Every structure is written in C-alpha cells, then in structure tokens.
Swiss-Prot record:
Claim: Plastid is one of the keywords in the record: yes
Compartments reported by the entry: Plastid, Chloroplast
GO BP annotations, alphabetical order: photosynthesis, light harvesting
Coiled-coil regions listed: none
Name of the protein in question: Light-harvesting complex I LH38 proteins
Pfam family, one: Chloroa_b-bind
Note: The LH38 protein is synthesized as a 100 kDa polyprotein and is entirely imported into the chloroplast where it is subsequently cleaved into 5 mature 20 kDa LH38 proteins.
Record has Plastid as a keyword: yes
Organism: Euglena gracilis
PANTHER family xrefs: CHLOROPHYLL A/B BINDING PROTEIN (PTHR21649)
Alphabetical list of InterPro entries matching this protein: Chloro_AB-bd_pln (IPR001344), Chloroa_b-bind (IPR022796)
Organism domain of life: Eukaryota
Length: 530
C-alpha cells in the first residue's frame, strides 16, 4: 500500500512502509535482520545529514568565488594539528554514542530540535534530501575525475550548450566503441583497430566504418540507405518513448495497446497522415537522381537548430532506439512481460532473472528444473547422480569414482572457474579500453616484482588450504567453496549452479585465447574484427 521505488515491484516482507523513506528497495536483503536494519536506518540519517552539509559546503564557496571544493584542502593547509582538532571535536560524540546501551534509537529524530519543529513530513523529507545529497556528492566526485571542473562551471557550460555539453558527451566521447553512443562527436570506428572500407571516409554523420556486406559501395544506394536510416531512427525513438512512458504512467504494457484501440480507426488515421508523405517521397520527393540527396537533414527545422553535432547525435540515438525496439520485441516473445516488469524482476533478483536464464548446459543459467546431460541420450556413470552443482554426467576417465577425489575436484573446479572468470575480464576489458592486447602486458610489467607480490598474496591462502583449511579429511563440512566469501548471504542453489557454468565457459575462453595468440599472433578483439 505504500509507494515503491519502481512501478510494479514487490517489496520484501520486512519492508512494510513503517519507517520514513521506506520504498521497498533492498535487493541484497540487508534489512532482513531487525538489528542490522536499525543500525542502517540510523547510519543513513547521519550520512544524509553530513552529505547535505557537504553539498552546501561544496557549492556555496564556489558560488561566492572562493574556489572549487576539491581545492579547499590544498588551500587550507590542513595538517596534523587540524586533524587532531577535528578528531577531538567529533570523537567525544562518537564515544558517547558508542557507550550508550539500550538507548532509544528514535533519538535520531529530531536530534537537536529545541523548537520542536520536527514532524512526520520533515522526517520523510530529511531522508529523501539526504539520499539526493549522497548521490550529488558521488556525482561531484565523478565529475571532478571525468571533466576536471567544478560543478558550477560544468553547469554553466551545459546551459550554454545543452546538446554538446552533457553527461553523454563526457562518457561516450571517451569510450572507444562509439558507434551506438548518443554523443554527436565524430571520433572512433565502430570497433577498436577496425579497418573501414575505402568507400566509408567519415564524411557523413555517424559513419563509423561499419559495412561488412559492402552495401554502401553504390553511391545511390548509400544515399538511400542513409536517408532510410534517419527515418527509421526517428520512428524508433518515438516508438521507444511510446513503449516506456505509458507504462511508467501506469497505462499498461506496450503490447497491450491493441486491446484498447480500434484497429480500423487507427489504420485509417495512420494512412491519412502517412499516405500523402509516402506519395510525395515515391514521386521523387528526395530528388535522389538529381544530386539533392540529403533532405533528411535538417528535415523539419524552422528554427535552424541543426548542426553537424546534432546530425551525428540523431543517427546514434536512432541506432540505439532501433536496437531497443528489437530488444523490447524479443523480450516480450521470450518472457511475455513488459520491459519495466522485466527490469524490476531483474533488479529484485539480478542473478536469477537475466538474459541468460533460459540457455542450456554451458549457459550462465543456474536453473535445474530437470537434469540435463552433456550429450543427448547418454548414460551417466552411476556415481554422478546430479546431486553436485553443474553435474552433467561427464566423466569419461572415471576420475570422480572416488568420493574424496571427487570432493577435491569439485572445490578445485570452483577455484579455477573463479580465476578464469577474472582472467577473461582482465584480458578483454583493457583491450576494449585501448590499453593493448593481454599477451603484451609483460612488456609493461616487471615480472619479478609481480611474482613476488602475487606470492605474498597467494602463499598464505595456499598454506591454509594445504594444511586442512577445507577439512577434507575431517567429519566437518567440506563445502567451504560455497559460499566462500559471502558476507551479504547472496548465495543460493541457483547461483552455485550458475557459477560453475560461467566458470566452465571462462576456462574454455581462456584456453581459446591462448591458442588464438599462438596461431594468429593477434589479440581476441583484432581476430573478432578480422
């Protein structure tokens, strides 16, 4: 009955709207324990108050011309003396707070309120403003590292050039895979180190050298395709808004619209609008054979707002929207639910509800509705009963016949899977960011120093494991690979199965990368482009 953080979501049973600011958001189940929930609520109020003060302290001096917030420490000359004063000031309060036992936690409201101004409304407002302030501080920090300017300076630039100076410009302009970015900058190819066809010179907006089928070789065809892309992109952007916004407003899912609309009437109205335009286009309205090929830009622009930047941005946003519409359709056919319903299900259970949940043996899905075997119609060994996670009956060498050996192998597989998943990310992400191929890393790293550091990290863990850390020969549990490190208690039967499957994929992936480097001498991304 209380407002929720996202439409159509289901709040956990322990979040019933009793407390201020409760919107039913707890995907990790952190508030299930009442004592922990109590501490977290108090901590949120404290951090929210500090954040609100910090936001004011960051913006007001900048507004008054006293400098940027992150320069304050450099200019204030803060040293050991100042730190000691700060510690003495807040240390007394922290000690007093820590020694009070069985104190009433509601004393966080109002805190200091000699005039008795606190009401239910102000308590709720304080939580909301505190959350905004916490988000704002995170934004200030990110903004500082991305653009290197103050919040007010960035705001002034944005107000002067809202289309060119925005978050998309800052993020997408730096990302090497820029084809589908919403920014209008004309830099980068569709994939790092790709070789564009000679006919794609970068002359036209959002040309990223992508034409594997050589469709743009004919100039007339290329002109038609460019105009068609703009048209379809515009329709897709309108379509995406038309799918998402009504559902946000509680008007139902996009695929239910036909149930409440007269199809014949809609068809006649659509034809009455589209037919004259299509007739004009079919009768040479774009003068494709007369050299006037670019009437898609600006299209309708009575205020003359179109620039090279907006043209490129329109194409990129259109491509995003075309992809989104295809995704909405595929999502509906696969799940039968609306995009927001799928999103809320994913956010509530990101591991159990995602694109991979319906795939097969080596998929990341952890579902075990019925046992699947590694090959159709085979007979698994009698000792592989499907009880263990990821057991698909594959053991041609009979290695798992001994229960103790099988136990060791299970734990070892989990370890190697986790390492492989980390390794695969470490191989691909740096190359996507333009930092070179994975096998070139030793050109930049001192191997001896790296080995010493790695040994210092790994050796204690291996010593503990080798000296009975997993109690393989004792009567106690041998399954400390699950959950391993799981302070938030997120591990479930599903995640254990999914981890094994993803790990097997990753081990195959790493083996493939190694073979690929020896056979072709190129990185995985370059091989993919080729």
């Amino acid at each position: 009955s209380h407002p929720l953080w996202f439409p159509n979501t289901l709040a956990p049973s322990w979040l019933n709207g009793e407390y201020y600011g409760d919107r039913g958001f707890d995907p990790a189940g952190l508030a299930a324990d009442p004592d922990t929930f109590e501490r977290m609520r108090i901590a949120e109020v404290y951090h929210g108050r500090l954040a609100m003060l910090a936001v004011v302290g960051a913006l007001v001096p900048d507004y008054l011309g006293k400098g940027i917030w992150y320069e304050a420490a450099q200019n204030a000359g803060i040293g050991l003396k100042e730190v000691a004063i700060f510690t003495a000031a807040y240390g007394v309060f922290e000690v007093a707070r820590g020694v009070k036992e069985n104190s009433d936690p509601t004393t966080i409201y109002p805190g200091f309120d000699p005039l008795n101004l606190t009401t239910d409304y102000t308590k709720e407002a304080e939580i909301k403003n505190g959350r905004l302030a916490l988000t704002a501080l995170l934004g200030f920090e990110v903004q500082r590292h991305v653009v290197g300017g103050s919040p007010l300076a960035n705001l002034a630039e944005h107000l002067q050039q809202p289309l060119q100076r925005n978050i998309a410009d800052s993020i997408m302009h730096q990302w090497p895979v820029a084809m589908f970015a919403s920014s209008g900058h004309k830099d980068g190819l569709w994939f790092p180190n790709a070789e564009p066809p000679a006919l794609l010179t970068g002359e036209y907006p959002a040309d990223r050298g992508f034409d594997p089928l050589n469709l743009a070789a004919d100039p007339d065809v290329y002109a038609r395709m460019r105009v068609a892309e703009v048209f379809h992109g515009r329709l897709a952007m309108l379509c995406t808004v038309g799918c998402i916004v009504p559902e946000l407003l509680g008007k139902g899912a996009w695929f239910e619209a036909g149930d409440s609309v007269d199809g014949l009437k809609l068809g006649f109205i659509t034809m009455a609008i589209a037919a004259p335009t299509e007739y004009w286009r079919g009768q040479g309205g774009f003068n494709w054979q007369k050299g006037e090929l670019d009437r898609s830009y600006p299209g309708f622009d009575p205020l003359n707002l179109t620039t090279d930047y907006t043209r490129a941005a329109e194409v990129k946003n259109g491509r995003l929207a075309l992809t989104a519409v295809a995704g909405l359709t595929a999502q509906y056919l696969a799940t039968g639910e609306s995009p927001l319903a799928n999103l809320s299900a994913h956010l509530a259970n990101p591991i159990g509800a995602n694109i991979t949940t319906n795939l097969a043996m080596f998929a990341s899905s952890g579902a075990k509705e019925e046992r699947e075997l590694w090959f159709p119609n085979i007979v698994p060994p009698r000792y592989l009963t499907g009880e263990a996670y990821g057991d698909k009956g594959f053991d041609p060498a009979g290695l798992a016949a001994d229960p103790v050996t099988f136990e060791r192998m299970q734990v070892a597989e989990v370890f190697h899977c986790r390492l492989s998943m980390l390794a695969l990310v470490g191989c691909l992400v740096p190359e996507l960011l333009g930092n070179g191929a994975w096998f070139q890393i030793w050109d930049k790293v001192d191997f001896n120093r790296f080995a010493v550091v790695a040994l210092q990290v790994v050796a204690p863990l291996e010593y503990w494991r080798g000296n009975g850390g997993f109690l393989w020969n004792d009567e106690e549990t041998v399954d400390q690979s699950y959950p391993g490190f799981d302070p938030l208690n997120l591990t479930t039967e599903y995640t254990k199965e999914a981890e094994i499957k993803n790990g097997r994929l990753a081990m195959n992936g790493m083996f493939g990368l190694e073979v690929q480097s020896h056979v072709t001498g190129k990185s995985p991304i370059n091989n993919l482009i080729d």
